Regions:
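Solvent-exposed alpha-helices and their adjacent loops that cap or buttress functional pockets
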Residues: 16-20, 82-83, 105-108, 122, ...
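Secondary-structure boundary elements
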Residues: 78-83, 132-141, 184-193
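Active-site-proximal alpha-helical scaffold in enzymes
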Residues: 117-144, 183
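Short, well-ordered, mixed-charge alpha-helical segments that flank or form enzyme active sites
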Residues: 99-100, 150-155, 206-210
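Conserved beta-ketoacyl condensing-enzyme motif
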Residues: 27, 61-120
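Condensing-enzyme catalytic core mediating Claisen C-C bond formation in acyl metabolism
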Residues: 2-62, 160-212
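Short beta-strand segments
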Residues: 28, 92-93, 142-148
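A glycine- and small-aliphatic-rich helix-loop capping segment at beta-alpha/alpha-beta transitions
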Residues: 42-46, 102-112, 134-136, 157-166
């Protein structure tokens, strides 16, 4: 039976971890929002929006993070004149417990939602799963997003800012920002393809402990 099934199902893999797309999805749009510190860096001119205040007019950093998530998805959709009905699935997350910023944003966006908690891998994971959905014929367009906020991450992982702890100039700093890409089956887009960016394959990572 296994041999029969293997002959029926086309294998779109290379090795144990890499999947190959027979109809490579296209990246048709993207949008970004970042905080003031990120805007001062070398990539500052390339971001769609740089906030002047990392609370963005909200009364908590968590609400600002939720706002970044929602605004970035809507921004990517607006660039290619997509309404909510034109996106089949939203994939993404943040760094907080129960990916609360992403969940509250998804409530407002009213899109079918797959919440992901991959920390720094969330963007790559959302693109990988999203493009697999497209190549498999389960979705025509997907929105893939990751967001984080320095101040919420400090509370979650390190030292809440209210403690007033000092850090060294070389200390790690979690990004305040959000980035969204919209991937699509290129046969749906026609002249709307805004570049030659396609996802042709993806490699699924694995947890490795070298015992160090």
């Amino acid at each position: 039976m296994a041999d029969i099934l293997n002959n029926m199902i086309p294998v779109k893999r290379a090795g144990r971890q890499t999947v190959l797309f027979s109809n490579p999805p296209a990246i048709i749009s993207s949008a970004t929002v970042v905080g003031p510190m990120e805007g001062k860096g070398p990539l500052g001119p390339y971001f769609d929006m740089v906030l002047k205040d990392d609370t963005w007019g909200e009364d908590s950093w968590e609400k600002a993070e939720r706002k970044m998530f929602e605004h970035t998805v809507r921004g990517a959709m607006d660039k290619v004149n997509l309404q909510s009905g034109g996106v089949d699935c939203l994939l993404g997350g943040d760094l907080l417990n129960q990916i609360i910023s992403a969940n509250f944003a998804a409530r407002e966006l009213k899109l079918p939602f797959l919440g992901l908690y991959g920390a720094c891998s969330t963007m790559a994971e959302s693109l990988l799963i999203g493009t697999m959905l497209i190549d498999g014929g389960y979705a025509g367009r997907v929105a893939c997003i990751a967001t984080s906020h320095f101040s919420t991450a400090e509370r979650q992982y390190r030292n809440p800012l209210e403690m007033g702890g000092q850090t060294t100039p070389t200390a790690q700093r979690t990004v305040t920002g959000a980035g969204c890409s919209i991937a699509a089956n290129p046969t749906l887009e026609g002249d709307r393809l805004y570049g030659n960016v396609f996802v042709t394959a993806g490699t699924i990572g694995k947890v490795t402990d070298l015992g160090i």
